[in-house]
UniProtKB/Swiss-Prot annotation:
GO CC, alphabetical: cytosol
Catalyses which reaction(s): GTP + H2O = GDP + phosphate + H(+)
Descriptive protein name: Elongation factor Tu
Protein's organism: Ehrlichia canis (strain Jake)
Chain spans, region G4: 135-138
InterPro entries per UniProt: EF-Tu_GTP-bd, EF-Tu_GTPase, EFTu-like_2, EFTU_2, G_TR_CS, P-loop_NTPase, Small_GTP-bd, T_Tr_GTP-bd_dom
Stretch list, region G1: 15-22
Keyword Hydrolase: yes
């Protein structure tokens, strides 16, 4: 039996630079630590988050701070990235696999370019739910101004396909909440209001009943214990003693899971949605690499060719300024790996303009573990130029 745990949800703060994402992250942990007991609730200071450890996601260095907190009903893992470029990379690479996002908007500025960009990205990478934290409300006396900013955000969310009229918008001040001694002041109540909005979000359907699959983010060698791979379990359950395969980039290898760890605790099992470390029997560190997947035996194969529906970003969205033609060769970011591939355009299509939606055929340089419905990003020269979804596997 997997031990009974509180339902787990992955959230992240998104929004424009300097609107207060990191301050809010600090305020959430601090107010909850004062208000609620729970081993997950420890207050984390702003500069601990701001000097976030660097992670490698798809070969790109990203600073991400992971904090955890819990309410009576749920356990939250929360990711905050101090840098703007880090957010973009993080959302596309899935390093911040968010079930829900807290969109932070400063009441003094309203929606800004990155606000739009982050909402668009959240939609493209499949973040289902958003709640809004209107920050810095302590410095705006004008009620009408606050209402205008709120209306603007709701319209923006609707424009990108979120239910803008129904989304919770909480007006608060993260700085003021941090200053309050007890955790029960007027601004701390606003933090609790935000938590209540998060509590209302329907729990993501974790694909626990499907065969186990986890994309490998990192590989470590632990003296005396062997090789550990880390990543987020995409679907299924892994128990100590289960047979598993390592698929993609190389020949398939078979091994056995000899340990599961999460937040430095040993567990009997890990399940969909968990960020876990898996100990592998008889596998050396050099036998396995980031970008491969761990899978229940026989469930996934690696392929080089597929068809996909892609959206090519406009220049204003940070995409290409010029069209591309058949045989264009960008990088494809699939799960935790990036591989060069060749794009073949459909019959009769000469070129693709920024802003186009198109069906393409892709031939990758190396075989990667993929399946239908999988999302990926297309990048070139350090920037994202498109995103897509696999519609058909060819070989």
């Amino acid at each position: 039996m997997v031990e009974e745990r509180k339902p787990h949800i992955n959230v992240g703060t998104i929004g424009h630079v300097d609107h207060g994402k990191t301050t809010l992250t600090a305020a959430l942990t601090t107010v909850l630590a004062k208000r609620l007991s729970g081993e997950g609730n420890k207050s984390v200071k702003y500069d601990e988050i701001d000097k976030a450890p660097e992670e490698k996601a798809r070969g790109i260095t990203i600073s991400t701070a992971h904090v955890e907190y819990e309410t009576e009903n749920r356990h939250y893992a929360h990711v905050d990235c101090p840098g703007h470029a880090d957010y973009i990379k993080n959302m596309i690479t899935g390093a911040a696999q968010m079930d829900a996002a807290i969109l932070v908007v400063s009441a003094t500025d309203g929606a800004m370019p990155q606000t739009r960009e982050h909402i668009l990205l959240a939609k493209q990478v499949g973040v289902k739910d958003i709640v809004v934290w209107m920050n810095k409300c302590d410095v705006v006396d004008d009620e009408e101004m606050l209402s205008l900013v709120e209306m603007e955000i709701r319209e923006l969310l609707s424009k990108y396909g979120y239910p803008g009229d129904d989304i919770d918008v909480v007006r608060g001040s993260a700085v003021k909440a941090l200053e309050e001694e007890t955790g029960s002041g007027v601004w701390s109540e606003k933090i609790m209001e935000l938590m209540n909005a998060l509590e209302k979000i329907s729990l993501p359907v974790r694909e626990k009943d499907k065969p186990f699959l986890m994309s490998i983010e990192d590989v470590f060698s632990i003296p005396g214990r062997g090789t550990v791979v880390t990543g987020r379990i995409e679907r299924g359950v892994i128990r100590v003693g289960d047979k598993i395969e390592i698929v993609g980039l190389r020949e398939i290898q078979s091994t056995v899971c000899t340990g599961v760890e999460m937040f430095h605790k040993a567990l009997d099992a890990g399940e969909a949605g968990d960020n876990a470390g898996i100990l592998l029997r008889g596998i050396k560190k050099e036998d396995v690499e980031r970008g491969q997947v761990l899978s229940a035996p026989g469930q996934i194969h690696s392929y080089k060719r597929f068809k996909a529906e892609v959206y090519i970003l406009k220049k204003e969205e940070g995409g290409r300024h010029t069209p591309f033609f058949s045989n264009y060769q960008p990088q494809f970011y699939v799960r935790t790996t990036d591989v060069t591939g060749n794009i073949k355009l459909p019959e009769g299509v000469e070129m693709v303009m920024p802003g186009d939606n198109i069906n393409i055929e892709v031939s990758l340089d190396k075989p990667v573990a993929i399946d239908q419905g999988l999302r990926f990003a297309i990048r070139e020269g350090g920037r994202t130029v498109g995103s897509g979804i696999i519609t058909e596997i060819l070989e």
